[in-house]
Amino acid sequence: MILGTGIDLLKISRVKKVHDKYGELFEKKILSEDEIKKKTKISLTANKLAKFFATKEAFVKALGSGFTKNISFKDISLKNKLNGKPYIILSDRVQKYLYKKTPRGYKPIINISISDEKDYVVSNVINSFLKK
């Protein structure tokens, strides 16, 4: 059972322009606390920032909320498994909101696909439910 799908397409140069202008302020707006802590371990290129931004946008679209109901970029952490597959960690508040939308006897599943080609990043998120 599918709750919703979300997709976001972003031109990397737009993110670079904003990041060049606002730097750390921009990072603090779109990155979770965990992502900010780990940024010293990874190189935050415009491409990576665009992937964070697009995936979080796609997730809230799939959730059906957008960035409302007190949901912000900081409530969503993008991570990768050892094999590179992306996944999301949600703040307690967003997790509770997702579980409220989950039918009894089901568990929420978040599927993510991120791709980039030259000047663009695209992220697709499908929020669905699986019977327990």
Indicate residue ranges for each PLM-predicted region:
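Core catalytic alpha/beta fold that binds nucleotide/phospho-ligands
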Residues: M1-K132
